[in-house]
Amino acid sequence: MRILYNLLLSGITESFSSGVTFQYSAVASMFISSSIFYFFIAHILPVNIVGSISLLYAIMNIMAVVFVFGLSNGIQHYLSYHLVRENHSAIMRLMRQTIAFSVLLALAAFIFMFLASGKIAMLFFHSSAYTLSIKLIGIAIAGSVMINVFGAMLLGLNQYKKYSLIYIFINIFTYFFPLLMLFLTGQSVYLIAGLASINILSAMLFLFFVYRIYGRLSGLQTKSVKEPYHNLIYYSIPLFFSSIMGTSATYIDRIVVSYFINLSYLGVYNFALIIASAAAFLVAPVSNLLIPKLSTFFSLDNKEGFRNSIRILLNIVSLIYIPAALGIAALSRILLFEFAGKAYTMAYLPLIIIMFVTSIFIGSTVLASGISSIRRTKIFIYSSGFALASNVVLSVILIPRFNIIGAAIAYSSMNAVNFTIVYYYSRKFGVNNYDISRIIKIWISSLIMFGIIYTIQGLLPYTMINIFIYILGGLLIYLVEIKIFRLINQEEMGYIISVIPDRFGAIRYLAKSLAYNEKKGNYDRLFRFIK
């Protein structure tokens, strides 16, 4: 019976390593598609129209989080928790209830945006001409609510490959179909209509795969276990408030820019944030995959392996993100000039500020996932609330005086505030396990690379070819530093190698040669499990 169960379960769960590979593919597709999208609209449309589109996307992201009601994190955790315990009846009941609830939330989102469209247009766009666009973005928000919840259900069931493949499809069409509508009609309102259409179709695609998994679960042996839905709601409520505050904190500076200054400055500032996201895509998949796997270890009550493995993940995230962010900072001016145009180069200093500050506090990605996995989600209300307050206060004070530089400082402040609170509670709950000496060595190596690249790019002309030369040069410098400063050991490198396909044998060999040998410890239990 156990063998039969494993065979059936193999069609439901997937390996963490393959999940990481596909998650990176999905996030890379989003970054590439969005970069191409904004590249074209920056060269086709006036700066103020680019700013209005950026503001519409910001409204969509904020309102989608509001109407998701925290369900995406809640259902992801509870499905993972019951999956490892083979409580399939509880899983199926949670899936049915969550699907129905998410559809109701999506309808509520559309109705709200439809009724409030006129007031939103006058308040933030200073023109009633945007009323139709706001109504259309209401449809996109409804689709986004369902996408987030249905996608979280696939992640909770360890369906990393399916989730990622669907998101690759969504990312491509979410940006290219609206762009096609813009090319065909020449009117930006059709771009928003294209986005709304794709979001609804994408939600239906996610729902189709969720129902397929539901059908497979119905054929498995199950235990008679019930999970009261109010438990999931109680788990989700703190995440609901923290998500609202966290997302609002992320976008509030853009809203303040549009309110106090104008949409043209918002278009310029938004492009700096788009380039800043290039480094974020390197660690975003880690957060998506950590919660289900750490929730599994919480279910198995393996506290030692859980905490000590946080150390590995903190080291890997820092090793990848910090040099990437500082590399972008070094090339900030040339990137803005080549990808957006001369009018956007004023955003280079805000971009440098954002890259350095986010690098300092990037560890909060891992620590927050660890805290979520042990069901201590209430603290995210504090962290998100104070982050929002910091961004609001500094935005109102600094943006009228310093324009987008003030916006960058306000935006960056929320990273510092959020990290401070998350770090405090991660120590309190026994989640934190920073390797301070390793992080310092990574910073020294990254700063050396930053100094060299920043100096050289200031001496040579701005060309696209030179950008690729600088990127290659920075990568080579950092690879040498990894070896010299002993920035990663064999155990940690084994985790990275495990997500590199076998056909890239040369890359796997190079990666292995960069790592140093360390006496094998007892801290890599999660690492061995997720492989």
Give the role of each language-model region:
Residues 135, 165-214, 385-393, 404-425, ...:
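Hydrophobic alpha-helical transmembrane segments
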